UniProtKB/Swiss-Prot annotation:
EC category: oxidoreductase
Residues modified as Sulfotyrosine: Y190
Residues engaged in binding Cu cation: H295, H297, H299
Protein name listed in UniProt: Protein-lysine 6-oxidase
Site label Cleavage, positions: D221, P222
Positions annotated with a glycan in the UniProt record: N78
Chief localization: secreted
UniProt source species: Gallus gallus
Start and end residues of each stretch annotated as Lysyl-oxidase like: 216-420
One GO term of the biological process aspect: peptidyl-lysine oxidation
Keywords per UniProt: Copper, Disulfide bond, Glycoprotein, LTQ, Metal-binding, Oxidoreductase, Secreted, Signal, Sulfation, TPQ
Gene: LOX
Modified residues (2',4',5'-topaquinone): Y358
Length: 420
C-alpha cells in the first residue's frame, strides 16, 4: 500500500480547515461563488486553494432590481425585532412628555404589505413617490425645558481640570515656528521654561484673567546685563532702521555721514520682571500705537527704558542716552505662571511672574559710544523712567554697572539695583 506524500496531506488538511471556517454553523444559504484562486508548486506537484474573499463594490444608487451579489442590508417590518432594537427596548425609557392629539391621517387606497423591505445602501436614495412627510415636532413640556436648563448649567460649571483659556495671547504662539520675526532668529528668542501641562490645575488667581488686584512692579535683572555686555562695530548701511528710531548719537545724522562709515556700539541685554500683583499695561491707548515697518511690530509706549553712559568720577553724561520704546510681551514666565501677552497689534503687556527679555543683538539695545574715549564709566539702565505707568515700588527700576572701556573692548562689573 502506497502512502500519499506528506505535502499533499498537509495541503488537504489546510483546505479542510479553510472550508470549515468559511461555512458558518446554521447557515442555510449556499456559500458565495469562488472568486480567488491561489496556486503553488512543491516537489513537482501543483497545489491550489480557492477563496471566497470579499470583492470591493463602489457605492451606487439602487435602480430597479439589484443583483443577488450586491451587499445590501435588509430590515424587515413584520414584527421581528433585531438585537440592537431589543437592547434599546430593554433600557429604561424617559417619562412620557405631554403631546398634542394626533391628527387623523387620510387612508390610502393602496395598502402596503406588512413585510415590506427597507433598503440601506451607500448612495441609495428613496424614490420620490415613497417619500414620507416629515414628522411633526412635539410640543415640549415644562419638564423638558427644566431638564435642558439643568444640562446647560452643568456644562457651563467649571470643572476641576483646566478649562479652555480664552484670555491667552491673541495672534501669537511662542512655540509656533511660523511666527514672523523679521527673519532674525535671535529677535526676542523665547527661552520659556516649559509648556503648561494639560492635566494640571490653575494656580489660584493666575492665568485666569487680567490682573487688577494691585499694582505692577518692574525690576530689571542686573546680572543679565553684566554677563553679556560687549562692543560691536557696524556700518551705517546696517543701521538704517535704528537711525529712523533715533537710536544713534547726534554725530550719526550729519550730512557728511556715508553708508560705509562705522559706528561703535556698546551692546547689552535687558530682562525686566513684573514681580507685582497686577498687569503692566502700556501707557498709550491701543489706537495710538505706532507701527514700525523696519521691525514689523507696534510700539505701545513712548519710553519703556532709558540708557545712559555716565563718567565714573563726575557722573556726567558722556554718551547721549536714548529712549527705547519696544513692544511689551511675556517672553518667559516663572514656574506656575502662563504667558498671556504678545508683541502684536491686539494685546501687549507684562503679566505678574513673567519676564520681558531683550537680547543684546536686537536693534536699539545699545548705546552709541563712537565719540567716547577709553576710560571708566557707569552704565545706567532705567525702566519706566518717566513713571508713566503706576507701580507699587519705583526704587528698584534702575540698574548701575561699572564699565571699563579700552577702545576695543568693554568690561562690565558690579551691576546692582540702585534707587537713583
Amino acid at each position: 500500500m502506497r502512502c500519499a506524500p506528506p505535502g499533499l496531506l498537509l495541503a488537504q488538511l489546510h483546505a479542510c480547515i479553510f472550508w470549515s471556517g468559511l461555512w458558518p454553523a446554521g447557515c442555510q444559504s449556499p456559500p458565495a461563488a469562488w472568486r480567488q484562486r491561489i496556486q503553488w508548486e512543491n516537489n513537482g506537484q501543483v497545489y491550489s486553494l480557492l477563496s471566497q474573499g470579499a470583492q470591493y463594490q463602489p457605492p451606487r444608487r439602487r435602480q430597479g432590481a439589484e443583483p443577488a451579489s450586491s451587499p445590501v442590508l435588509l430590515l424587515r417590518g413584520n414584527g421581528s425585532v433585531p438585537r440592537a432594537a431589543a437592547a434599546a427596548a430593554a433600557r429604561p425609557q424617559p417619562e412620557p412628555q405631554p403631546q398634542a392629539q394626533p391628527q387623523p391621517r387620510p387612508r390610502s387606497s393602496r395598502r402596503q404589505p406588512l413585510g415590506r423591505r427597507h433598503w440601506f445602501q451607500a448612495g441609495y436614495r428613496a424614490p420620490s413617490g415613497s417619500a414620507r412627510p416629515a414628522p411633526r415636532r412635539r410640543p415640549r413640556g415644562r419638564r423638558s425645558r427644566r431638564r435642558e436648563r439643568a444640562e446647560r448649567r452643568r456644562a457651563a460649571a467649571p470643572s476641576g481640570l483646566r478649562p479652555g483659556r480664552e484670555d491667552v495671547m491673541v495672534g501669537d504662539d511662542p512655540y509656533s515656528p511660523y511666527k514672523y520675526t523679521d527673519d532674525n532668529p535671535y529677535y526676542n528668542y523665547y527661552d520659556t521654561y516649559e509648556r503648561p501641562r494639560q492635566g494640571s490645575r490653575y494656580r489660584p488667581g493666575y492665568g485666569t484673567g487680567y490682573f487688577q488686584y494691585g499694582l505692577p512692579d518692574l525690576v530689571p535683572d542686573p546680572y543679565y546685563i553684566q554677563a553679556s555686555t560687549y562692543v560691536q562695530r557696524m556700518s551705517m548701511y546696517n543701521l538704517r532702521c535704528a537711525a529712523e528710531e533715533n537710536c544713534l548719537a547726534s554725530s550719526a545724522y550729519r550730512a557728511d555721514v556715508r553708508d560705509y562709515d562705522n559706528r561703535v556700539l556698546l551692546r547689552f541685554p535687558q530682562r525686566v520682571k513684573n514681580q507685582g500683583t497686577s498687569d503692566f499695561l502700556p501707557s498709550r491707548p491701543r489706537y495710538s500705537w505706532e507701527w514700525h515697518s523696519c521691525h514689523q511690530h507696534y510700539h505701545s509706549m513712548d519710553e519703556f527704558s532709558h540708557y545712559d553712559l555716565l563718567d565714573a568720577s563726575s557722573h556726567r553724561k558722556v554718551a547721549e542716552g536714548h529712549k527705547a520704546s519696544f513692544c511689551l510681551e511675556d517672553t518667559s514666565c516663572d514656574y506656575g505662571y502662563y504667558r498671556r501677552y504678545a508683541c502684536t497689534a491686539h494685546t501687549q503687556g507684562l503679566s505678574p511672574g513673567c519676564y520681558d527679555t531683550y537680547n543684546a543683538d536686537i536693534d536699539c539695545q545699545w548705546i552709541d559710544i563712537t565719540d567716547v574715549k577709553p576710560g571708566n564709566y557707569i552704565l545706567k539702565v532705567s525702566v519706566n523712567p518717566s513713571y508713566l505707568v503706576p507701580e507699587s515700588d519705583y526704587s528698584n527700576n534702575i540698574v548701575r554697572c561699572d564699565i571699563r572701556y579700552t577702545g576695543h573692548h568693554a568690561y562690565a562689573s558690579g551691576c546692582t539695583i540702585s534707587p537713583y
